[in-house]
Amino acid sequence: MEFAAFADRAEAIESESADTAITEAVTDLFRASGSDLSTLARFVQGRVFPAYESRTLDIGPRLCYEAIARAAGQNVSADDVEQRLADLGEIGAVAASYDLGGQQGLAAFGAGGGGDDALTVAELDDELRNLAAVDGSGSQGTKVDILFGLFSRCSSTEAGYLARLVLSEMRIGVGEGTVRDAAAAAFDVPVEAVERAVQVSNDYGMVAEVARDEGESGLATVTLEIGRPVQAMLAQAGTVAGALEDWDRAAVEWKYDGARVQVHFDGEDARLFSRNMEEVTDPLPEVVETVESTLDAPAILDGEVVAVDDGGDPLPFQEVLRRFRRKHDVAAAREDVAVRLHAFDCLHAAGEDLLDAALETRHDRLESLFPADSDVFSQMWLSDDAEEIESLEAEALAAGQEGIMLKDPTAAYSPGKRGKHWRKRKPDVETLDCVVTGAEWGEGRRANVLGSFELSVRTDDGYATVGNVATGITDEELDDLTERFEPYIRSEDGRDVVLDPAVVFEVGYEEIQASQSYASGYALRFPRFLSVREDKTPDSADSLARVERLAESQ
């Protein structure tokens, strides 16, 4: 398929407002996709790579502006593009506003494609993968060259959607649910079969191809693959009384103040993945050593990595993140902050997928993988007694942990799902994970430092504001945050700064109030900064629907 045809279809999809019409349009796209089906299943969501891959284009907004400016002609600069973005508000509209095709870049296709033929979806996919592979000295210039060549071959409509795709800002109303339903409709297979295959593979493109080529029977053969992470099962807040009322008895585990990790062991080598499915094997060598020296057969485990002091007592969550972020001099970091794995679930063991097994069964398999005296697997207690559970909670808190997890012992493991089968009980006030979409420069001696941050939550078509936070951030943290946000500055107007959504804050608050001052219709009363959620992306931040539920439950 030519990229122009995809861009036209994306434009048509974006013009629809009804979910059914959007799904029908994506269904038609899939039926017409031919050999490009896998790629289009990603592109239509604004993804270049499958969700389980940690690869990125590593293209900041400024590099994209430079490529657009070069393709637009000698009289256009990156600053001009940025100013037009401030006027138009969206990078796709900016790219589409220039006449990019036919500029002097047509002679430069050695870096960005091939000749004056129409750009195809397959060729664009190849070029973007080449761009992602560029590394080392001069890599930014090479990336701009590749983008320049691609933009120079684009019509206005194509350029708009290319810019959105490159900056992960497609936002045409197509989410994972739409792709799931469209794949099922396009190839006449049950939605449940598609969803199940996606749960175990985390690859919508591959699943769509299997649905088309092999049907429902083929989807049933899609299984977990060691080395290919899946989304983590998530918990909602809950109470002991509610859990016992729903399940009669509960599985109780300590809730560790750590970072989620998925362990993949192929029988020889271990690989570790964060909650966002980014590989974190290299920063955590002691966890790798523990797994490789203990396990005998292939396995996929779910767990938490906790930072500990010399006595083995837990350290704050931020200490774990220091290790997760460390890319260089890992040995020194290991000396400064030790980490320990607490595995609490088993998704696969010795060739057998266990997602559909009951939690109680999965935990038995988990224990069987380790020596009886091992402290690697997390203890689990079964109880139907509220007082006993509260006693276990007190023990967890006394040991420096966050609280307890309450789980339905009969429930299967549902990747990516936040539901009633796992419930977290913490004494802390509920927090929100908000996307930072704006900021404000300080005043006086802090004029060159960002001092206040605009908080937003996810909606179906973007983000909606819920407030601003400045409380709880030290001067040192403000300096660090300013440096962190600089690559994501989209535009500035006086002290006001518009930021590309890239960073997630964990925010505490006293109350959620109805408010017309913010786009969400809600405002956080007395918000306070708690931490940067290094383990989360904007796609996994809290949603407006959750804000609504929390507001109703106050």
UniProtKB/Swiss-Prot annotation:
Organism domain of life: Archaea
Residues binding ATP: E253, R260, R275, E304, F344, R418, K424
Pfam families tied to this protein: DNA_ligase_A_C, DNA_ligase_A_M, DNA_ligase_A_N
Annotated GO biological process: cell division; DNA biosynthetic process; DNA recombination; DNA repair; lagging strand elongation
Active site, UniProt feature: K255
Top EC class for this record: ligase
InterPro entries (UniProt xref): ATP-dep_DNA_ligase, DNA_ligae_ATP-dep_bac/arc, DNA_ligase_ATP-dep, DNA_ligase_ATP-dep_C, DNA_ligase_ATP-dep_cent, DNA_ligase_ATP-dep_CS, DNA_ligase_ATP-dep_N, DNA_ligase_N_sf
Reaction equations catalysed: ATP + (deoxyribonucleotide)n-3'-hydroxyl + 5'-phospho-(deoxyribonucleotide)m = (deoxyribonucleotide)n+m + AMP + diphosphate
PANTHER family xrefs: DNA LIGASE (PTHR45674:SF7), DNA LIGASE 1/3 FAMILY MEMBER (PTHR45674)
Protein name per the record: DNA ligase
